[in-house]
Amino acid sequence: MPSGEARIEALFTPEDDAIGNIVAAVGKARHDIRVQAYLFTSRKLANALIRARHAGVDVQVIVDQEQLEKGGVSVAAELAAGHVPIYLDGDHNNAHNKIILIDAASDTPVVITGSYNFTVAAQTRNAENVLIIRNWKSLAAAYRDNWDNHRKHSRPMQ
């Protein structure tokens, strides 16, 4: 159960500015950001992650290996050039998670999840949903444990 301080914001595209809210949350990170993505072509989000990395935040990204090979993770080179470690999850038919964890072990964790792939189409053309869940420590810990488990079987992008 969430603590009394937990806040949940629901966003629906294309009406709501999901990417703006996601980028704003990323910009407030202080310690670490963990991303798990199926499709990732949003330069706005990639640039926000690179800015966070340059500000000293520990940023790491897991992407679906097959989607990377098919071009569905077109920002991978930019992230790598920005010194953001990228890991390839090829152990599943689809590594279909779409999550961002911000300061997951802190007193003010943020979990971002939903149907929303990190793409321009998800914001402008698709009917998608995004939940931004703040201050729910046990949920953030569960998502972080899951992220860590996927990281264990993922390989670094070369």
Please place each PLM-identified region on the residue numbering.
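PLD/PLD-like phosphodiesterase catalytic module centered on the HKD motif
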Residues: 1-6, 10, 18-19, 44-158
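Short, flexible loop segments at the rims of nucleotide/cofactor-binding pockets, characterized by
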Residues: 9-14, 35-38
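Secondary-structure "cap/kink" motif recognition
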Residues: 18-32
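Structural motif
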Residues: 31-34, 110
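Active-site beta-strand/loop signature of hydrolases that rely on acidic residues for catalysis
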Residues: 33-37, 60-63
